[in-house]
Every structure is written in C-alpha cells, then in structure tokens.
Amino acid sequence: RTYLSKVNNGQEDITIQNFISRRSTHEEWTSGGSRTIMFPCRTVISPETDFLSAAYEIQNMQNRIYMHSNYDPAFIVDEMRKRYHTPEHTSYESCYLTYQPMPVKVENEMLGTIRQHAKWFANGAATKKMYLTVSHTEDGGMNFSYHYQTAHLEEHDMELLYYYMMRILFK
C-alpha cells in the first residue's frame, strides 16, 4: 500500500483488491451458490501516519470487509463499476493481494519428518495487472509470489516493488 502511494505521487487514497479465504470447509465446498473471494480494501492514510497506526488502520478495514465475504461476486463488480465509473471488463484496482499467514504443514505421523514445500507455477496468463501472494515459511520467513501482466509491467517493476516493500518493512 505504501509503495503504491509512493509511485502515485504520494496518493493517500489507495485501494487494493484483497483476497478472502476461499471455501475452506467441506460444508462450504458442497453448499452451492456463489461466494466472493475478493473484496476492495480502500484506505486513506496521510503520510504523517506512523507505520503501526497505518497497519492497524488497514487491519481494521480488512476485518470490516471480511464480514461481507458471502456477497455475490457479480454484485460487488457492479457496485464498483457504479461507484468508480469504470469501463466494462476493467477494474478500479491495479493490485491484488493474498496474504496467507500460516505455513502449510502436513500433520501426518506416517510422513515423519518429511518436509513439504509447495511451489506455484503460473500458466503465463495473468488476469490482473499485478497480483501478489505473501505466505509464511516454516522457518519464520516469507515467500513473495508475483504474477503480473507483461504488457504493462516488467520484471524490473517487481524488483522495485520488492526492494521498497523490504525498505518499508525493515526501516
């Protein structure tokens, strides 16, 4: 969010399409119907706001939007189009984010100490301008997985994003 503000001349009003956990229980998988998997997360944060205050502001916004994960996805798209007057098949948000706070561990005594590692392979057809997935590793680190449209962005853009994110996080 801070990086998007930086590259947009200090814009305080930033919206990121924040992914909500997918259907995770057997009942949710077999219930039918539709459920939104993402929701716009809009925050207006001034440059004078300290890092922790901004983080809590974003967390509070996320907690409010997660309550609405049972909305119809088509309804949300229509509402966004009405509010921001976006053309058909476009989006107000240029960045999509999934944050997975827990490392994946297989709880199976038959596997003993065999470690599991999942690696994502994109098919090269990025449907969003930029989509970032952040997940934890078993050793306490983090994985950053970037998917982006090469017609609009280059690998150097992702390197800059990563560089500034690390400066922001570890400043």
Feature roles, as predicted:
Residues 12-19, 51-53, 72, 121-171:
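Extended, hydrophobic beta-loop-alpha segments that form or line the acyl/peptidyl-thioester binding
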Residues 1, 5, 55, 59, ...:
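Short amphipathic alpha-helical segments
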